[in-house]
Amino acid sequence: MLVYGKVNFTNLSRYSCLSEKTYRRHFLKSFNFPQFNQYFLEKALNPEHTVIAVIDCSFLTKSGKKTDGKAYFYNGVAGKSEEGLEISVISIVEIETRLSYSLSVQQTPSRPQIKPAKKLPQKPKNCWSRKTRKKPDSQSSKPDITRVDDYAQHLKNTRYFFPSSVRYLVADGYYYRSKFWEAVRELNLDFIGKLRVDAVPTLSLYR
């Protein structure tokens, strides 16, 4: 359906016999989009062609002050982190036709940013006692769950809907981290991507 103006519940009701409240009630219910997209993938894909899975993120500009999930994400177009929304997209790509079919899209939740530890004020050595002297804990500021964990969980939730012939997962260098790499191995997939600059390959991964 093609509509003029913004795509919201109010505008959709103008092009339909349903009211705005009906659209809002329906959107409150959960819907299995990966299963829905899987049905059409089975009709669109050629069983004789080679297919691979691809995962990547997309930045969405958002100026609202109370938007859920709004945080600072990397914007590839601007080449820097900006405030907005981010979605994680998993697609199935047909090699021969070079067509990409979106299978699952998930919004990246906002996570607390890692803040540098505050420096303690300098005091004379005589004012410090052994009982009160404490070293700043650098690990306390690190979040337990990171965005890499969100991407890995998104992959785990979508793996069931992959075509049976999918063997390879393609992603850029950002995903080449231990948490995401371990999730790929658990799902019996082969990872294709560019190594990070600080990556240290070991032979134990291939044994």
What would you call each of these model-derived segments?
Residues 29-121:
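Active-site-proximal, Lys/Arg-enriched surface segment
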Residues 126-207:
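An internal, acidic/charged active-site-proximal segment
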Residues 2, 13, 76-80, 141, ...:
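Short, charged/polar micro-motifs that form catalytic or ligand-binding hotspots
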Residues 21, 70-72, 99, 166, ...:
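Intrinsically disordered, low-complexity segments enriched in small/polar residues
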Residues 3-5, 9-15, 21, 29-32, ...:
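Phosphate-ester processing/binding pockets and catalytic centers
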Residues 1-65, 71, 157, 180, ...:
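Electropositive nucleic-acid engagement tracts
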